[in-house]
Amino acid sequence: MRELSAIHAWQAADPSVEIVNVDFVSGAGAVVERFEAARSVTFDGGVYTTVIAIRNMNSDRAARRLLAQFGGSASISDGGFNDVDYHSGEPWAPTDWTISSDSDSIEWFTDTFGVDPNANALRWSTMYTFWFDSTADPTMATYSLDLFKPGSPSSVTIPFSGMSPVIFTDGFESGDLTSWSSSTP
């Protein structure tokens, strides 16, 4: 794990964790800014639990919103968030991001740069964690990250593969063996 960010330790401990880079060129400059995103999905008793960690590698523009958009109806619950506890006179607001969900999406967000330049954005060299439960397969959702400081682009897509890291989805992992028989193992 030497010379890698801490987010890679999660994948070393759990090989089902998917890590992707979210790169973009900010404005007309040639500077590539990068976020790293990792996702873990588990399935138990008809409910998917998704955990997402996002690390700001070098983006001065920071991030202010994460959106998971499902293609259809989903029952979404137990959304959570973990951030950095700023201290020692840091000017950044310590306010947790707001969590909002409806029938086909869940989002976490803080104020825009225009409202509060010191809002609790996902700033350079920090990592925030987000999680939720859903009845719809979260590997089929589209994930996007809105940037905090104004500029182009204003949002970037997180390129998770769309492939489910869940190996078995036939109901047996829940302990329900009612559809199993000796003729059809």
Where do the language-model regions lie?
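Low-complexity, intrinsically disordered segments enriched in Ser/Thr together with acidic residues
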Residues: 109-141, 147
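Short, exposed beta-strand/loop patches in secreted or surface proteins that constitute
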Residues: 41, 94-102
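Extracellular carbohydrate-recognition regions
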Residues: 166-182
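Low-complexity, acidic Ser/Thr/Pro/Gly-rich terminal tails and inter-domain linkers that flank the onset
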Residues: 2-45
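Short beta-strand elements of extracellular/lumenal beta-sandwich folds
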Residues: 38-60, 64, 70
